[in-house]
Regions:
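Mg2+-dependent phosphoryl-transfer active-site scaffold
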Residues: 1-192
């Protein structure tokens, strides 16, 4: 079943108007982001599914993750978002530790991103996939031979560890481009 994540500046606004049931972890606690927008067995008092999300998936229930992504706080309009996405970011900024540590999903990976030097959304998506447990074994290959050397293996499904699908990684790479351009835009506004 597909993994669906939907990003929001504030997920509570969407959930306030959408009838849903909260997903449950296998520890019996509420899932941080997952909800069901269809009928599923649930506790009517807590509004939490009585099936953990893995069991629910095996029975054909479809969980959607509603994620808070604060990057979108600085986006003013749909047109502004499109402009931020369309603008080529200053990729070299990712090699600056202070800048890299402000960036969604790559903070803490300054040393590796400085070695690999992604220069496109596709390469940044590969970088995001590389830092997941299921693909870390490809890091030395990429360090030695570049992103082209891993492009056939990076998107192959793995059963033993968590990995990013290409669509997921590419989406997050686009969010990073938006964030990079927002930071630069905000700095430009300060100097004007």
């Amino acid at each position: 079943m597909p993994d669906i994540d939907i990003d929001f500046a504030d997920r509570t606004k969407a959930l306030a108007i959408l009838k849903h049931i909260d997903a449950r972890l296998d520890t019996d606690k509420k899932h941080n982001t997952g909800v069901y927008c269809t009928s599923i067995p649930h506790n009517p008092v807590t509004n939490i599914s009585t099936l953990d999300y893995k069991d629910a998936e095996s029975r054909g229930y479809f969980k959607i993750d509603f994620l808070n992504v604060s990057v979108y706080d600085g986006v003013k309009t749909k047109e502004h978002l499109t402009q931020l996405l369309d603008k080529e970011p200053i990729w070299e900024l990712l090699e600056e530790k202070d800048f890299c540590d402000k960036i969604f999903h790559v903070n803490g990976y300054h040393n590796l991103i400085s070695k690999l030097k992604p220069r496109s959304v596709e390469q940044l998506a590969m970088f995001l996939a590389l830092i997941r447990p299921g693909k870390k074994h490809l890091i030395p290959i990429c360090e030695k031979n570049g992103f082209k050397s891993i492009k056939d293996d990076i998107w192959q499904k793995t059963e033993e560890s968590y990995f990013f699908k290409k669509s997921h990684a590419t989406s997050y790479a686009c969010v990073i481009v938006v964030q990079m351009n927002l930071i630069c835009e905000q700095l430009t506004d300060l100097t004007d």
